Swiss-Prot record:
Highest taxon above the source species: Eukaryota
Residues holding [CaMn4O5] cluster: E365
Residues where Phosphothreonine is found: T15
Lineage per the UniProt record: Eukaryota, Sar, Stramenopiles, Ochrophyta, Bacillariophyta
Topology term for the membrane: Multi-pass membrane protein
Protein's recorded name: Photosystem II CP43 reaction center protein
């Protein structure tokens, strides 16, 4: 291949460990070093090394970050007040957590962190081996692991294997929830507890009803799930569908319409993957912000509506003890100050929190009757744990506003408190958005290449290539 630049210009930038290794330079790949794994499109062994090393980095982060959180854990404070995002995920699996969402032991978290660190070392070694010492391509030495991007049957077989692995992962959660100690259920009586999910929902009308719901208003799409039976039942269905679909793709060849409809190249597969990850990222952002079943508020802090309703409830409890008649007191607008009716006639909390009248949360549900909040329960059956939890949630809204939002004063929170819901929602949203941009970019390039026209910028026309070296 014709040299497009002065080699001397780049000597200080890159000194290859072994210049004979494939995928190292622009002459052998057509891509410069900053193009990353594009250099490895046609060297499957080196691409395997890159992916294994990347997996090692991810596992290392998980292990190191869990140990970091464990080392900073303060038992007297809730996890959502300590800037954690990983301990909560382990706690929801039933590890180290007791009634009311109290962290009872950090030993399981320490063990998980160490296991991840050890695993990352193994993956890291595998990544280095395949990047530097292993065969450049797998097709000759290990035909089962080798592939050609244009081999449609092989590509769908690889897809099938991935689907089967995802299905197995889904069933691991099901097994943990049903047989291996259970999972944390925020809806358990008395404020949440670890329990076995003995009767998961298997009714397809219920499970797939979430998928076909509207994402707007009170419908909430899949994010509206509000009980552990549906969550575990959903994982059973997902696991079954993934494994059945995986077996299908392993043992069949793509139909003619699929061969015509899709672009079959490495960059096309990358774009498909980026689109899938983007969708998962957006879904995770919505879940972490709105859902208080998969993301229990005892661990992640209240949702925005939950904090607002908590404040209304806290002031209702206070003023009722001071002698206020909470069922008839009027606010400055003439509407109910503490209680009022929703558009559908339910009794709801009054004041600015009325906008969140359809909130469902474990601490308030015991106070409801057949027509919204039960006046008799409000006056005679409020439990201390409900008061404590509402008072705590009231001051920990996941809001960064400098003024009142939904009736919740947030100026203090904007200074010294950031909810894990804010972190998780914003990070997943922005990452998902940029993954979507990546999907558009790579899908456009893949389609252009398949159509036979421009593949990137012609480097031969870059002015810098005709300039003399700096030194």
């Amino acid at each position: 291949m014709k040299t497009l630049y002065s080699l001397r210009r780049y000597y200080h930038v890159e000194t290859p460990f072994n210049s004979s290794i494939a995928g190292r330079d622009i002459e052998s790949t057509g891509f410069a070093w900053w193009s990353g794994n594009a250099r490895l499109i046609n060297v499957s062994g080196k691409l395997l090394g890159a992916h294994v090393a990347h997996a090692g980095l991810m596992v290392f982060w998980a292990g190191a970050m869990v140990l970091f959180e464990v080392s900073h854990f303060v038992p007297e404070k809730p996890t959502y007040e300590q800037g954690f995002i990983l301990i909560q995920h382990l706690a929801t699996l039933g590890y180290g957590i007791g009634p009311g969402g109290e962290i009872t032991s950090t030993v399981p978290y320490f063990a998980v962190g160490v296991i991840h660190l050890i695993s990352s070392a193994v993956l890291g070694f595998g990544g280095i081996y395949h990047s530097l010492l292993g065969p450049d391509t797998l097709e000759e030495s290990f035909p089962f692991f080798g592939y050609d991007w244009r081999d449609k049957n092989k590509m769908t077989t690889i897809l099938g294997i991935h689907l089967c692995l995802l299905g197995v992962g889904s069933f691991l959660l099901v097994i943990k929830a049903m047989y291996l100690g259970g999972v944390y259920d925020t809806w358990a009586p008395g404020g949440g507890d670890v329990r076995l999910i003995t009767t998961p929902t298997l009714n397809p009308i219920v499970i797939f009803g979430y998928v076909f719901r509207s994402p707007f208003g009170g419908d909430g799409w899949v994010v509206s799930v509000n009980n552990m039976e549906d969550i575990i039942g959903g994982h059973i269905w997902v696991g079954l569908l993934c494994i059945i679909g995986g077996i299908w793709h392993i043992f069949t060849k793509p139909f003619a319409w699929a061969r015509r409809a899709f672009v079959w190249s490495g960059e096309a597969y990358l774009s498909y993957s980026l689109a899938a990850i983007s969708l998962m990222g957006f879904t995770a952002a919505l879940y972490s912000w709105y859902n208080n079943t998969a993301y229990p508020s005892e661990l992640y802090g209240p949702t925005g509506p939950e904090a607002s309703q908590s404040q209304a409830f806290t002031f209702l409890v206070r003023d009722q003890r001071l002698g206020a008649n909470v069922s008839s007191a009027q606010g400055p607008t003439g509407l109910g100050k503490y209680l009022m009716r929703s558009p559908s006639g339910e009794i709801i909390f009054g004041g600015e929190t009325m906008r969140f009248w359809d909130l469902r949360a474990p601490w308030v549900e015991p106070l409801r009757g057949p027509n919204g909040l039960d006046i008799n329960k409000i006056k005679n059956d409020i439990q201390p744990w409900q008061e404590r939890r509402a008072a705590e949630y009231m001051t920990h809204a996941p809001l960064g506003s400098l003024n009142s939002v939904g009736g919740v004063a947030t100026e203090i929170n904007s200074v010294n408190y950031v909810s894990p819901r804010s972190w998780l929602c914003c990070s997943h949203f922005f990452l998902a958005f940029f993954f979507l941009i990546g999907h558009w970019w790579h899908s456009g390039r893949a389609r252009a290449a398949a159509a036979g026209f421009e593949k990137g910028i012609n480097r031969a026309n870059e002015p810098v290539l005709s300039m003399r070296p700096i030194d």
